[in-house]
Amino acid sequence: MTDRTCLSIVLAAGEGTRMKSNLPKVLHRVAGLPLVCHVVNAVRGTGKSDVALVVGRGAEDVRSAVEKIAGPVSAFEQKERLGTAHAVLAAREAIARGYDDLLIVFGDTPLIEAQSLLAARERLAQGADLVVIGFRPASPHGYGRLIEEGGQLVAIIEEKEATDEQKKIGFCNGGLMALRGQHALALLDAVGNDNAKGEYYLTDIVAIAHGKGLNVTAIEVPVDNVIGINNRAELAEAETIWQNRKRRELMLSGVTLIAPETVFFSYDTVIEPDVVIEPNVFFGPSVHVASGALIHSFSHLEGAQVGEKAEIGPFARLRPGADLAEKSKVGNFCEVKNAKVGKGAKINHLAYIGDAVIGASSNIGAGTITCNYDGYNKFKTIIGDNAFIGSNSSLVAPVEIGDNAYIASGSVITADVPADALALGRARQETKEGRAKILREKYAAIKAAKSVSK
């Protein structure tokens, strides 16, 4: 089947009014990725496929989001909302190019899996002309029923038109379809609008195809594959399902999640085997954690690379560009952004490291700050191998600290420090004996005078 050409038509023109949002519905996110992009990723998982995007409100934004993950796509605007078949025909120009297979999917079904779409395409390769993706919900009420006779799908009957006997059928229409390209335009053009709403319904092509003697069939997929998102509650439900899938996938691959339900991943999170993740950890986009790493509770990672046997947290934040080498450590209440942390280096507590390079085995004391921004530009801090930065030090970039250098606690470092040097950048302490007693007596007298005056 791999040599069969395919066009995937992604219907993404819905108004999404129930989302009550200025953002187009298909651009709302699950696991950090727009709904429509989840669908496109599933389509791409079936093999090589061109994508035709049918858009409406926010057309350019929708197209841009898809092209970020899929490269250039054809976009077609549905100027009037006259039904699902009408929406598909908005992509007539693309359909007419001639493809072996057509996939018709909805941009608001982010949980559809590539294997479900692949199963539909495989049916086409085996001789089917039209394949409808169906499912069996706990209660079929409200769904269109798939009517089968002799192993063939003969019609889709909506709930309000179904007989009492047909309403007993538990096999329901999931809305997604695959059809042989050579029949596509003829079937779509045969759909009429003789119904109460005067719309062109995609479901009608089943009866039309059956009437033409074509091979029409249905396949069953898990219920969650065809869940459509219409409001924020359903969006949250989809997020829950996606996260549970990801958690199970990772645990089965050798990752330990101590409290799985409290850990949240993004669409592209990569966690290698033998990583241990404690409760209440959040992964934003573009995070890769190598084998043997330990992520403590209440850590937040985004755009970060974590090396083998590294240790993060608790209460650590890794921002985009954080690159931690093997056995390095970023501890509690530390933030690392756009910085390379060398092998075995330690940033144990209460530090901000931004736009920096930390050498191997260096130790960054509590309260260390890389002062990287002057209000206009970012500057770099470079710390060599085996350096020691004393607590409560401020490193004012651009600045370079050499190998084995030692920075005294409380220093403000504004100039480069050579290798093996000791740098002190603070005012000398002055101690005045007995002065504290004098100050206490003075302030007590002032306070007493104020009380009398009241």
Curated annotation (Swiss-Prot):
Known EC number: 2.7.7.23, 2.3.1.157
**Taxonomic path:** Bacteria, Pseudomonadati, Pseudomonadota, Alphaproteobacteria, Hyphomicrobiales
The protein's name is Bifunctional protein GlmU
Q: What biological processes does GO assign it?
A: cell morphogenesis; cell wall organization; lipid A biosynthetic process; peptidoglycan biosynthetic process; regulation of cell shape; UDP-N-acetylglucosamine biosynthetic process
User: What cofactor(s) does the depicted protein rely on?
Assistant: Mg(2+)
| InterPro entries tied to this protein | Bifunctional_GlmU (IPR005882), GlmU-like (IPR050065), GlmU_C_LbH (IPR038009), Hexapep (IPR001451), Hexapep_transf_CS (IPR018357), MobA-like_NTP_Trfase (IPR025877), Nucleotide-diphossugar_trans (IPR029044), Trimer_LpxA-like_sf (IPR011004)
The similarity comment for this entry is: In the N-terminal section; belongs to the N-acetylglucosamine-1-phosphate uridyltransferase family.
Q: Which UniProt keywords apply?
A: Acyltransferase, Cell shape, Cell wall biogenesis/degradation, Cytoplasm, Magnesium, Metal-binding, Multifunctional enzyme, Nucleotidyltransferase, Peptidoglycan synthesis, Repeat, Transferase
- A Pfam family matched by this chain, by name? NTP_transf_3
Extract the ranges annotated as region (N-acetyltransferase).
254-454
Binding site residues for Mg(2+): 108, 230
Q: Which reaction does it catalyse?
A: alpha-D-glucosamine 1-phosphate + acetyl-CoA = N-acetyl-alpha-D-glucosamine 1-phosphate + CoA + H(+); N-acetyl-alpha-D-glucosamine 1-phosphate + UTP + H(+) = UDP-N-acetyl-alpha-D-glucosamine + diphosphate
Query: Where UDP-N-acetyl-alpha-D-glucosamine is bound, by residue?
Result: 11-14, 25, 78, 83-84, 144, 158, 173, 230, 319, 337, 352, 363
